[in-house]
């Protein structure tokens, strides 16, 4: 489990994030409220604050690799990895990676999907932080965790911008330590 000492103060990042996320109703399906981070991405200073908070978390956890979940997780994982001098591992939707892969099916808030990772994505014992934009039902995070552990990674946590607490996604992440900048 994550120690209190390794947790950065996320209050500044939470305030910035709250001011730079917009709700899109009925996307991608009726009844779903999509959390659009485009305003965050298009505001360099705001994006920098959020990336900085995630990088501080990664450093505190001793992460040597950052795993980004397709697609918006890629937008966060790459600059975090750059800031901490870590490698990056893409966790992709089915059929998007060449070569030998591991696959894991999971349920979404609005359907089902499959994630994949290269079989040799991380060396055994590599300290990996998973980064994504939203923790909703927890299916994506749980699948990513399973894939990384299957490669032999030491998954040190999951960091997300937003956690939709009403969907109880944290309950599906098992022993995975979850850090969310903002809870909704």
UniProtKB/Swiss-Prot annotation:
GO terms for molecular function: adenine binding; adenine phosphoribosyltransferase activity; AMP binding. The gene is apt. The keyword Transport does not apply. It is found in: Cytoplasm. Catalyzes a salvage reaction resulting in the formation of AMP, that is energically less costly than de novo synthesis. GO terms for cellular component: cytoplasm. Belongs to the purine/pyrimidine phosphoribosyltransferase family. GO terms for biological process: adenine salvage; AMP salvage; purine ribonucleoside salvage. CDD domains: PRTases_typeI. Keywords: Cytoplasm, Glycosyltransferase, Purine salvage, Transferase. InterPro entries: Ade_phspho_trans, PRibTrfase_dom, PRTase-like, UPRTase/APRTase. It catalyses: AMP + diphosphate = 5-phospho-alpha-D-ribose 1-diphosphate + adenine. This is Adenine phosphoribosyltransferase. Pathway: Purine metabolism; AMP biosynthesis via salvage pathway; AMP from adenine: step 1/1.
């Amino acid at each position: 489990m994550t120690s209190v000492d390794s947790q950065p103060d996320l209050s500044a990042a939470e305030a910035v994030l709250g001011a730079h996320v917009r709700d899109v109703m009925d996307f991608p399906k009726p009844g779903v409220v999509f959390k659009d981070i485009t305003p965050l991405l298009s505001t360099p200073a705001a994006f920098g604050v959020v990336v900085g908070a995630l990088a501080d978390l990664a450093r505190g956890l001793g992460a040597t690799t950052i795993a980004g979940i397709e697609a918006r997780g890629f937008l966060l994982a790459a600059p975090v990895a750059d800031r901490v001098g870590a490698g990056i591992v893409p966790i992709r939707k089915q059929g998007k990676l060449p070569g030998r892969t591991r696959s894991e099916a999971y349920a979404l808030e609005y359907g089902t999907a499959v994630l994949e990772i290269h079989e040799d994505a991380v060396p055994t014992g590599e300290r990996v932080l998973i980064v994504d934009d939203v923790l909703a039902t927890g299916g994506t995070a749980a699948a990513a965790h399973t894939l990384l552990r299957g490669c032999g990674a030491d998954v040190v946590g999951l960091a997300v911008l937003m956690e939709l607490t009403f969907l109880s996604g944290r309950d599906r992440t098992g022993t995975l330590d979850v850090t969310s900048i903002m809870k909704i």
